[in-house]
Amino acid sequence: MSAASGRFPGLFPIRYTVLVLCAVGTITGLGAALAWGGWWWLLPLVLGALSAVGVQDLRQTRHAVLRNYPVIGHMRFMLEFIRPEIRQYFIEGDHENLPFSRAQRSLVYQRSKGVSDSRPFGTLLDVSAPGYEWVNHSMVPTKLASQDFRTWIGGTPGQPLPGVDVCTQPYHASVFNISAMSFGALSANAVLALNLGARTGGFAHDTGEGSISKYHREHGGDLIWQIASGYFGCRNPDGTFSDEKFVENARDPQVKMIELKLSQGAKPGHGGMLLGAKVTPEIAAARGIPVGQDCISPPFHSAFSTPLELMHFIGRLRRLSGGKPVGIKLCIGHPWEWFAMVKAMLETDITPDFIVVDGAEGGTGAAPVEFTDHVGVPLQEGLILVHNTLVGVKLRDRIKIGAAAKVI
């Protein structure tokens, strides 16, 4: 063998060794099978199949690895395929890895199954490590009147909030709710399970921008109807907002609040598309779009274009819904754009009943990696900015703030 040339002298490149061995083994095995029969036929069959794979590897032009290393090159793709499982089961620690550590996942599994999640001895965390978080306790704890942690959104019954076009049907919301995930991105069974959980647990289920399907309605769990730039469930044939269709859904007793999505943490400013092949009759009926056609959510709204117009649109939605709470969901980008929205609240005296801050670490069905990894303000920084701004202009008491982005 020549090390300099990387070839067996006068024969073939070393990287073809496995293919050559398979071919030679096929011929040898065939002779053995003809001579002795029985199980010997397995040898030429297996090696012959591998030889055929190797020939196809040499002919294909899609993967350079397979073309240069026929047969054996498939090991690379097999190892890539099982790499996540190898890391999860044998390498990663209990408190590392993203988006959720093994300890966090185990806690969710235990509580979902009703298994005890208590632990003896003490914390396994390094309390001196950077990023360690804790909660300061009180030296004089009090007894809670209830463990059902809830808050009123849109005022309280009989005591509406100050301002113009205010809410007249406040909602007593749980402090934990199901974040927005659309039917279409989720299966029917997933939507059914989430809404049944919402009804059983006494919290709200955000529909996501895909509007309200029959599966959202089947179990009767409270709904937060999310409306995005595609206006699904409340759109005209040309994709613009429809007052009449909005009223049909918004005044459904199961719909407790309306959430106007301005941007999404995982892909702020990007919009989205559901391929026509996925637009089934059920999805089309829920969204009010043609079956089998690409379903596009523009990156911007057509019903408003300025902060002042946004506030008037919020007031319009509140009137059309019969006075239900109307809020906005956004991922903070340029701070001055958020400040402009707050200025519009002060000028119009119209405020959203709630603001959901979506962190840049939030999830989605599909988004470009650049948007997912590097666009938008993370949750903690966004929450601080929104809270401090509203406190500074004395609007914090009128607006409830929610958070979304891998909250566990």
Q: Model features per residue range: what roles?
A:
Residues 2-206, 210-220, 225-237, 241-266, ...:
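Conserved, well-structured core domains of diverse proteins
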Residues 257-263, 281-291, 352-360:
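Non-cysteine beta-strand/loop elements that form the S-adenosyl-L-methionine
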